[in-house]
Amino acid sequence: MRINPTTSGSGVSTLEKKNLGRVVQIIGPVLDVAFPPGKMPNIYNALVVQGRDSVGQPINVACEVQQLLGNNRVRAVAMSATDGLTRGMEVIDKGAPISVPVGGATLGRIFNVLGEPVDNLGPVDTSTMSPIHRSAPAFIQLDTKLSIFETGIKVVDLLAPYRRGGKIGLFGGAGVGKTVLIMELINNIAKAHGGVSVFGGVGERTREGNDLYMEMKESGVINEENIAESKVALVYGQMNEPPGARMRVGLTALTMAEYFRDVNEQDVLLFIDNIFRFVQAGSEVSALLGRMPSAVGYQPTLSTEMGSLQERITSTKEGSITSIQAVYVPADDLTDPAPATTFAHLDATTVLSRGLAAKGIYPAVDPLDSTSTMLQPRIVGEEHYETAQRVKQTLQRYKELQDIIAILGLDELSEEDRLLVARARKIERFLSQPFFVAEVFTGSPGKYVGLAETIRGFQLILSGELDGLPEQAFYLVGNIDEATAKAMNLEMESNLKK
């Protein structure tokens, strides 16, 4: 088996003019390789170690050049386990960076860091390859117009809107609905924007990656009958992989997303789960590469590595990559260098709350903790901004009153506060919404709610026009008209029971 061949500028396969070296040192996932004088590979070139281990099994380990050491030696990081490697083994310089398949043929498939399919569905039907190391788009290519990326999810669009071509941090513990929210976003971008998604599983649990794949097949995001109809490509470099793979798998996913943006001119959603593991993998190999550790033991190149990934995620005049990144916060310390460096790049945060999930309000997005730089009157308009601020004020006041309600009960509140609490509870329930991808589990059809409809609904609740409706009428509905229809149905049902 050979790694995906790359071609040099002349179109000649680099394997035809082999540049051979030898392994001279192995320290865990890091190898030193000696090459003949004058034939040194460039930094980021792909190398392949070939040979046989002690029991005669073939070895084929891809590496990436990280440092030129002098004395005709280079230091490289392995992309797979280095078990069985010995000094003196032959190393082939590919003459180009790791290249991965791109284009429509990647949809519905699962890849590893090298762009090799790992889903047992045969080879990928494409000859289009792209190197994982590229420079960010030039400033003149960027689309600097600020525009909102409508998701069709009420709580997100109203209170913490996403920027088209922006970066969003997704915070939440286990079991609060991260995966379902991610799948709904993948579904909605395909329906509303004709876009596709790329999911990069960076250093997370293999079981979760498998569960996500199964759930995507179940909900139709991946179409098993006609794989080309799928809406997402998956790239996994999970916890069991060596740090080299976890450090580069984010770039593999990003490269696939860039092709959809630049060549197909589509809107793309790029999911990275988890951006912290990207930093963690870099820190694991940093010391082995001989770099002095920086604050809290992280690599000294932390900001540069993060910047080189994040700056490629942007809107150009062709299309956009909007990125949603799950952020693990070690020991809940927001000042830790890894999350602190990530925050500098984010345009919005979506915080999932266990309290809301426990109440059964899904999506369990915390309306007061979630933020967005887009929520400004000059960007979203006065009407949207005013409505969002009034919703937040109402919910904040309700939060302040909850202790009093718990101790003394609702009756001890003033008339004004009782009215505010009733509206806040309606708002809280109206922020819930049935999802398309959860239809299989809930039985209720999913709803995509446009931004104008969302604003109209919350304005009606705030104005007091719907004070007479029961609060359960607002739970798990789409737009406000469905809430009024549900209220009428509830009334009819209660009359029939009488």
Curated annotation (Swiss-Prot):
Residues annotated to bind ATP: 172-179
EC id: 7.1.2.2
Annotated SMART domains: AAA (SM00382)
Chief place where the protein resides: plastid
Listed CDD domains: ATP-synt_F1_beta_C, ATP-synt_F1_beta_N, F1-ATPase_beta_CD
Catalytic activity: ATP + H2O + 4 H(+)(in) = ADP + phosphate + 5 H(+)(out)
Subcellular location(s) per record: Plastid, Chloroplast thylakoid membrane
Gene Ontology CC annotation, any one: proton-transporting ATP synthase complex
Record bears the keyword Ion transport: yes
Biological process, per Gene Ontology: proton motive force-driven mitochondrial ATP synthesis
Keywords annotated in UniProt: ATP synthesis, ATP-binding, CF(1), Chloroplast, Hydrogen ion transport, Ion transport, Membrane, Nucleotide-binding, Plastid, Thylakoid, Translocase, Transport
Membrane topology: Peripheral membrane protein
Entries under PROSITE patterns matching the protein: ATPASE_ALPHA_BETA
Cysteine disulfide partners in this protein: none
GO MF annotation list: ATP binding; ATP hydrolysis activity; proton-transporting ATP synthase activity, rotational mechanism
Keyword Hydrolase: no
NCBIfam families referenced in this protein's UniProt entry, alphabetically: atpD
Family that this chain belongs to: Belongs to the ATPase alpha/beta chains family.
Biological function: Produces ATP from ADP in the presence of a proton gradient across the membrane. The catalytic sites are hosted primarily by the beta subunits.
HAMAP family to which the protein is assigned, alphabetical: ATP_synth_beta_bact (MF_01347)
Subunit structure: F-type ATPases have 2 components, CF(1) - the catalytic core - and CF(0) - the membrane proton channel. CF(1) has five subunits: alpha(3), beta(3), gamma(1), delta(1), epsilon(1). CF(0) has four main subunits: a(1), b(1), b'(1) and c(9-12).
Protein name per its UniProtKB record: ATP synthase subunit beta, chloroplastic
